[in-house]
Amino acid sequence: MIHNCYFQFLFFVIEYIYIMSALCGCKKNRRIIMKKFLSLALALIMALAMFAGCAQQGAENAAEEPAAAEAPAEVPAEQPAEEAAAATVFPLTVKDQLGNEVTLEHAAERIVSGYYISSSTCIALGLKDKLVATEEKIDKRPIYKLAAPELIGKVGNVGSAKAFDLEACIAAEPDLVILPKKAKDYAATLAEMGIPAIVVNPESHEKLVEMVNLIAQLTGAEEKAKALTARYDEVMKKVEGLTANIADADKPTVYMCGTSSYLTTAPKDMYQASIVTSAGGKNAGDSLEGDSWTDISYEQLIAMNPDVIIIPTNNMANGQPDFTADEVMSDEQLKEVAAVKNGAVYNMPTGFEAWDSPVPSGVLGMLWMTAKLHPEVYTMEEFAADAADFYKTFYGFDMDTSSILGETVEKAA
């Protein structure tokens, strides 16, 4: 189009020059006129070429501008694709907490949990509708009555870690089985049968978070897991801040009992030991090796001479272990132990969960222990409010804090 304009214009100029030279008669004058008009014509052609080039560049820029203007509008459209890329893609192969490789073809829809801790985790992750079988005696555990009453009497029973019911597990037709370390041999058996099974062993805060994320990844509950682990981090930072300025000399030695006997305690690598140290205490059993409840003698307990003795709940309906605080206080062999002499033998609250165990609510154990050991930095009233908010957020029920606050009122009286 532009080239045609050039030729038409040039033809017009030459024709114009010819006519003018003819009118001028004299050959000399015609040559002079011809030179002037040719110079003028060339100047005009160059000007027109420059104008056309600018016009063409402007048109190209104008054509590009809408695309540039539209680019920001494409960003939101790309975001879902990025989010989808970040989500778990199946088939998925993971390693469980014992290092076993497990592959799932799709997100689990039918879950068998043979471990109370993983069952509670599934409830906290919003997966209770996917539980088709659980550990035994769920009707005796308060958390089921409070947060998942619809499971009681409606789902299968696969026994305990010590007596796992393989047949009941298979009958539930699961596409994911979650087992504790004590039942690890059954995981291998299930794998041979083509049933994906993972083994979990959350014996530290880090391992607890790892377990939560592992279960979430296999079930499509990543968003819930993100919120839950964020709360863990929040509580950990809170406790760390509360106890940061407590001098080592002001940190009491704390003896954590087992639920079967007060001559059973938590060694240094057990989850319960981390609760004590996080809350500004010293674990009396830190000289003991291992990550499970360890039996000791009277002589060992007397030598530990703890300032505080804590008796955890047993996770069942009455929440009481196989002995009472009064039994500990009245044991003649312990009368010289500091905790007994000073009446510092305490039961953890009952009616909810064992906050000394690595369940999702285990972080509440750190807060409770902080309030018990250092009420000057964190009160039991503050703990009750934090605990109620946790259960409402992740388990969906309103917590009755009267048993916690009742203890405080009774002590004050």
Pin down the residues of each PLM region:
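Extracytoplasmic substrate-binding proteins
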Residues: 86-87, 91-94, 101-103, 186-264, ...
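Short, Lys/Arg-enriched N-terminal segments with co-localized hydrophobic residues
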Residues: 3-33
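Bacterial lipoprotein signal-peptidase II cleavage site
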Residues: 50-64, 69
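Short helix-initiation/N-cap motifs at beta->coil->alpha
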Residues: 97-99, 155-167, 289-298
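A short, structured surface patch at a secondary-structure boundary
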Residues: 113-172, 176-178, 182
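Bacterial N-terminal signal peptides
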Residues: 43-49
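Alpha-helical, coiled-coil/dimerization segments enriched in small aliphatic residues
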Residues: 265-292
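Proline-aspartate-enriched helix->loop->beta-strand connector
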Residues: 158, 166-179, 195, 297-314
